[in-house]
């Protein structure tokens, strides 16, 4: 069983990679779930439900031993750890699970990713609008958009992911985790 975990900011090529290289496997995409629940993939009002459904789908696929592409930004080791914990919590044969982390290197190029998102939105492709300015939750609008915030998070996880993998493999000798750099 293969669990593909792309790590990348909006516009880094996560969905494009899946469509091109893994078109026939189950995709779990929180944006798609948001659209199904709220009618808008940018609407975060039902986010708790979105994530509950995503992890329920992941556990069901694990029980059925089905390959999965977990299509989210996955910009923290905490997010990846939750996927890992969910799969191993439901797996019947832990030695048959292969985690394939796809580090989307185009995430290093903030402007390229921003231009891809803008082009999609201009062409009315239904996607989350990460070009909106960030609200600091204190009533202030910050002078950058969500892509900039995601870019900063990517630069951190890009360093942390290898240490996370080493620790997991040391703690769980059955863990099979590969990291592949995709793009730039």
Model-derived regions: residue spans:
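Pre-Walker A (Motif I) flank of P-loop NTPase domains
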Residues: 1-4, 64-66
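Glycine-rich phosphate-binding loop used to anchor ATP phosphates in small-molecule kinases
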Residues: 46-98
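ATP-dependent NMP and nucleoside kinases share a basic, alpha-helical "lid"
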Residues: 36, 75-125
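Conserved substrate/cofactor phosphate-moiety recognition/catalytic segment
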Residues: 12-68
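Conserved beta-strand segments of the P-loop GTPase G domain that flank and frequently precede/overlap
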Residues: 69-71, 101-105, 181
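Conserved GTP-binding G-domain of TRAFAC-class P-loop NTPases and closely related GTPase folds
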Residues: 2-7, 12-15, 24-26, 94, ...
């Amino acid at each position: 069983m293969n669990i593909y975990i792309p790590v990348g900011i909006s516009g880094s090529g996560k969905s494009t990679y899946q469509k091109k290289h893994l078109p026939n496997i189950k995709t779990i995409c929180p944006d798609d779930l948001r659209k199904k629940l709220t009618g808008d993939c940018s609407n975060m009002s039902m986010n708790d439900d979105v994530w509950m459904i995503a992890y329920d789908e992941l556990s069901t696929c694990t029980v059925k031993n089905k390959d999965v592409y977990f299509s989210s930004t996955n910009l923290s080791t905490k997010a990846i750890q939750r996927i890992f914990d969910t799969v191993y919590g439901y797996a019947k044969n832990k030695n048959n699970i292969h985690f394939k982390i796809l580090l989307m290197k185009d995430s290093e190029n903030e402007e390229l990713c921003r231009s891809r998102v803008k082009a999609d939105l201009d062409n009315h492709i239904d996607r989350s609008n990460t070009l909106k300015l960030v609200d600091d939750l204190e009533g202030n609008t910050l002078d950058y958009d969500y892509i900039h915030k995601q870019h900063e998070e990517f630069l951190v996880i890009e360093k942390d992911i290898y240490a996370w993998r080493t620790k997991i493999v040391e703690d769980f000798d059955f863990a099979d985790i590969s990291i592949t750099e995709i793009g730039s």
